[in-house]
């Protein structure tokens, strides 16, 4: 799943899509997920600032929304969630000379807001599961 924050993807739309597959008895596997930080212009690669807080937050929000649509909104339907790499220093997206910074860690292996968004979502979900009394 290769997406960009400038695409009009919402958690609700993704949740409905995943539910539709589940309603047909299918499992959903989100695989090869990467979310480009930089936008493309007319199909060409562009350069952007990998430290731009607005871009980083949009990327983090989309990572979080995809995971939430998968595991929180469709428990039992979504059975896999995998990224296409770990850090921005080694990504297939940079093969054409552009830079896209699509992963959870930057080029220095520092956590990006996307990592924190996924971690916080999973942690809050785990805490709810552990604290349930039923």
List the predicted regions and their residue ranges.
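Aromatic-rich peripheral "rim/lid" segments of glycoside hydrolase catalytic domains that contact
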Residues: 9-29, 33-134
């Amino acid at each position: 799943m290769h997406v960009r924050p400038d695409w009009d993807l919402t958690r609700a739309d993704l949740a409905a899509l995943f539910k539709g597959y589940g309603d047909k008895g299918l499992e959903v596997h989100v695989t090869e997920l990467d979310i480009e930080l930089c936008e493309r212009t007319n199909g060409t690669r562009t350069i952007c600032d990998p430290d731009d807080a607005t871009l980083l937050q949009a990327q983090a929000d989309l990572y979080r929304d995809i995971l939430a649509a998968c595991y929180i909104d469709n428990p039992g339907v979504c059975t896999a969630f995998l990224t296409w790499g770990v850090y921005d220093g080694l990504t297939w997206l940079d093969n054409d000379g552009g830079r896209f910074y699509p992963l959870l860690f930057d080029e220095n292996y520092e956590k990006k807001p996307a990592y924190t968004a996924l971690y916080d979502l999973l942690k809050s979900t785990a805490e709810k599961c552990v604290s349930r009394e039923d």
